């Protein structure tokens, strides 16, 4: 899946260790973080989503599962964003 590899590459390139440590402490060290703030994470997700729109629409469930299986919390949050938007588009009036 090229969407996941592109998203992972861009998120890892924009990681910030200085922000990751306080984020992990805030969540009581239950999750690892890349240190990407919400606004930046959403813009990265949005640009990659537009590049791979058809792939995301057809495989959103498997993409979300794969993102949830990654260690860092930012991937989990991207999966939640994808799931919410795709479910609203497909199943809600």
Positions of predicted regions on the chain:
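Surface-facing alpha-helical segments and adjacent helix-coil boundary elements at the starts of domains
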Residues: 1-93
């Amino acid at each position: 899946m090229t969407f996941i590899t592109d998203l992972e590459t861009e998120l890892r390139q924009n990681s910030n260790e200085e922000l990751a440590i306080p984020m992990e402490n805030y969540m009581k060290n239950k999750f690892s973080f890349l240190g990407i703030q919400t606004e930046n994470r959403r813009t990265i997700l949005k640009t990659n989503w537009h590049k791979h729109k058809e792939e995301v629409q057809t495989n959103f469930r498997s993409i979300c599962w794969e993102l949830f299986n990654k260690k860092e919390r930012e991937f989990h949050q991207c999966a939640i964003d994808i799931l919410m938007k795709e479910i609203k588009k497909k199943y809600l009036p």
